[in-house]
Amino acid sequence: MHEKLVTGLSRHQISTRIARGEIVKQARGIHTWGEVDAQELAKILDQEWPDAVLDGETALRQYLGLQLKFPLQLASRKQHAGGVNVQVRRLSKLEWWYVNGGRCVAPLTALGSASEEAGRRFLNRYYAGFDGKRRLSQDLAGTKYMSKQTRALIDSVAIGADSAPEREIITALKQARLRVESNYEIGGYRWDIAVKKHKVAVEIDGYGYHSSDKMEAFLKDHWKPNDAAARGWTVFRYSGSCVKHHKDYVVRQILGQCEGTPFLPPPLWKWHKLFRPGGWRG
């Protein structure tokens, strides 16, 4: 029993203490001694409503191991009246997973009651990395109930991308209706972005990741594009600064290659921000 949960008082006693500011009503039948934070209230509801589990953005934060925030979103097979800090949706068919000490609806189900922005942030973070697509496939196979909007959101996100610049370019290419893969393997080498239909491979480098300080990385950075080119792929390579300052050029060049209308900008030093005075400071 949570120490802040109010028990053993009559309705009249509770009403009196609410008026005095000693008790706070959180939801129908759920009162606490004073204010509680979102984590505390989630624990109380887990005890008092065993049929209810975390849902929506609350569940997404739980999956990511983040601090919970109000309002708490829950799902239940039963009807529960929520409150200012608690929102409950009723699901006739409810599947849940135990994650980081709490019960949550399946991650892809939780997306259905989260905002598009929160859902996009979650997908980008939760399914990042080279095994992101594999983990997403597993979760898709294990999720029985998912809305069309959720499927559309998943299709629009850069699943498996490792960095923000990669996600920006993948999102832009998907908006142009290209089928794009991230962390795609060609000849044993992994490429940040690939458009398989048009055999276009893209690598987006940070400032330090592909430095030539080590001979192994130096050699790989040469033989990797050689291998892709020998297999008939068009290879593009950009820096994170190219995406930051000239994303339109990056996207136009990739799209142009896919559409058969190559985009050929002037020589780099005539337009790239980093070639201007003070460019390396921003």
Predicted regions located by residue number:
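Short gly/ser-rich loop at a beta-strand->alpha-helix junction or flexible surface loop bordering the NTP-binding
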Residues: 1-146, 259-282
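Surface segments flanking catalytic/ligand-binding clefts of nucleic-acid enzymes
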Residues: 130-282
